[in-house]
């Protein structure tokens, strides 16, 4: 899976950061220290970490990922990363 989306809401300085969905690479999620959860009302699982996005981006860079784009939608910030 060469593409990855991460996101955070409201305050990017403190986290949590959403780092994957139920189809994400388990080995990568373990490297990030992510936990899998299902939020009440959602019919899907997501992986999250308590780290702020900057820490997550640093960890992903060590795994060969590079940021392609970043945007803000309402109070949510989203980064799209790619691994060659």
Curated annotation (Swiss-Prot):
InterPro entries xrefs: GFRP_sf, GTP_CycHdrlase_I_reg
Single GO term (MF): enzyme inhibitor activity
Main location: nucleus
GO cellular component term of the entry, any: melanosome
Gene3D superfamilies (UniProt xref): GTP cyclohydrolase I feedback regulatory protein GFRP (3.30.1410.10)
Intracellular or extracellular location(s): Nucleus; Nucleus membrane; Cytoplasm, Cytosol
Gene Ontology biological process terms from the UniProt entry: negative regulation of biosynthetic process; negative regulation of small molecule metabolic process
Pfam families for this protein: GFRP
Keyword S-adenosyl-L-methionine: no
Keywords: Cytoplasm, Membrane, Nucleus
Function: Mediates tetrahydrobiopterin inhibition of GTP cyclohydrolase 1. This inhibition is reversed by L-phenylalanine.
Family: Belongs to the GFRP family.
Subunit structure: Homopentamer. Forms a complex with GCH1 where a GCH1 homodecamer is sandwiched by two GFRP homopentamers. Interacts with GCH1.
Identification of the protein by name: GTP cyclohydrolase 1 feedback regulatory protein
Upper classification of the organism: Eukaryota, Metazoa, Chordata, Craniata, Vertebrata
């Amino acid at each position: 899976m060469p593409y990855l989306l991460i996101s955070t809401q409201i305050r990017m300085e403190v986290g949590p950061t959403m780092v994957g969905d139920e189809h994400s690479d388990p080995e990568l999620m373990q490297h990030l220290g992510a936990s899998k959860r299902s939020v009440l009302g959602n019919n899907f699982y997501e992986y999250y970490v308590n780290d702020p996005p900057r820490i997550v981006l640093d960890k992903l860079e060590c795994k060969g990922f590079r940021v392609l784009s970043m945007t803000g939608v309402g109070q949510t910030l989203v980064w799209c990363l790619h691994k060659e």
